[in-house]
């Protein structure tokens, strides 16, 4: 397709959802309002708000949040005037009832997330979101785990259920730039021209920004990113870095770079109890193709059982574990202990 460098990119911030993983879902109300105010002032298009694992993610399996999803959403709704509030729903964790509550609290966009080969389970939630009048997005996680052609078939299912935008989601931060290019070409070949596409990158191989740029070159409309890369694993594509790169490329991003830079360093980075960066453990996620939010859980298991976090993560990758199988991390640790 012909690349249009002048089109307005849709900047989708995920600091208050994916970023929640980086601090074990412990954002205070004051934290979320300070971050949301800065993002709103910088004129991002949307701000995603939820537990890291989406609506109703607060649980023994994923980690309990400092507040409920609704408390966080309502807090953000009080302070934003420009950005629209988005939320994330994983069918089986959140239900249509939780989605309605999120809508009533102020969310107007929902990203319905499934494993990249399980779009079928999103039908009810996508259809219901459309009934509510929400901007409805299909979110295909762990997109490195299937072929571009299969990914396109799953994307087409989500489109048929009513999603008007489909995301290629690199949950493991394992995609190369060529991988991204091939997936966008396959997906866009099957989808209607009116259906938008989005990229959600992770930075585990330091390719978060590069992969987002490649996606835009392939006609991607929406770009997920977070302040200071705040997110699972080595984090997401850092928002201020992507915007600076887009500015250098002459792309129309519509946001204020300096406001984003200040918010990243002054508000977000000080909250990190573990640096969000590429290091031995987060690099193992990208190398082994492991769901990025497994990081903190694997670190806890490694400390408890006297193991190497890297060994646990690489074994999880070998077993092709996917999002939602956090309970298997301890099983893997116990198996490694017996070797």
From Swiss-Prot:
Catalytic residues as annotated in Swiss-Prot or TrEMBL: 21 (proton acceptor)
Domain Pyruvate carboxyltransferase: 9-261
Binding-site residues, substrate: 17-18, 171, 200, 291
Residue numbers marked as site, Transition state stabilizer: 17
Catalytic activity: (S)-4-hydroxy-2-oxopentanoate = acetaldehyde + pyruvate
Chain positions recorded as Mn(2+) binding sites: 18, 200, 202
EC number: 4.1.3.39
InterPro entries to which the protein is assigned, alphabetical: 2-IPM_HCS-like, 4OH_2_O-val_aldolase, Aldolase_TIM, DmpG_comm, DRE_TIM_HOA, PYR_CT
Protein name: 4-hydroxy-2-oxovalerate aldolase 2
PROSITE patterns: PYR_CT
């Amino acid at each position: 397709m012909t690349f249009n460098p002048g089109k307005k990119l849709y900047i989708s911030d995920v600091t208050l959802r994916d970023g929640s993983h980086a601090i074990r879902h412990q954002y205070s109300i004051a934290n979320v309002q300070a971050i949301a105010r800065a993002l709103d002032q910088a004129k991002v298009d949307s701000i995603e708000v939820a537990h890291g694992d989406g609506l109703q993610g607060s649980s023994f399996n994923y980690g309990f949040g400092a507040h409920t999803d609704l408390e966080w959403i309502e807090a953000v709704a009080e302070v934003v005037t420009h950005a629209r509030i988005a939320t994330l729903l994983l069918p089986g964790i959140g239900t249509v009832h939780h989605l309605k509550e999120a809508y009533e609290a102020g969310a107007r966009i929902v990203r319905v997330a499934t494993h990249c080969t399980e779009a079928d389970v999103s039908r009810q939630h996508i259809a219901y979101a459309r009934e509510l009048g929400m901007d409805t997005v299909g979110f295909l996680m762990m997109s490195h785990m299937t072929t571009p052609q299969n990914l396109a078939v799953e994307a087409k299912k989500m489109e048929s259920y009513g999603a008007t935008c489909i995301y290629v989601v690199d949950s493991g931060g394992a995609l190369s730039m060529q991988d991204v290019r091939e997936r966008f070409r396959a997906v866009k070949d099957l989808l209607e021209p009116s259906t938008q596409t989005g990229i959600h990158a992770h930075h585990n191989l330091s390719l978060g920004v590069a992969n987002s740029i490649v996606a835009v070159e392939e006609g991607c409309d929406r770009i997920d990113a977070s302040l200071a890369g705040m997110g699972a694993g080595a984090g997401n594509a850092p928002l201020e870095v992507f915007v600076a790169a887009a500015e250098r490329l002459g792309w129309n991003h519509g946001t204020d770079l300096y406001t984003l830079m200040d918010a990243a360093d002054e508000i977000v980075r000080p909250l990190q109890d573990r640096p969000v960066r590429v290091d031995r453990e987060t690099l193992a996620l990208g190398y082994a193709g492991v769901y990025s939010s497994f990081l903190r859980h694997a670190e806890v298991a490694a400390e408890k059982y006297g193991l190497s976090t890297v060994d646990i993560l690489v074994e999880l990758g070998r077993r092709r574990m996917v999002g939602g199988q956090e309970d298997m991390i301890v099983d893997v640790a116990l198996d490694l202990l017996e070797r």
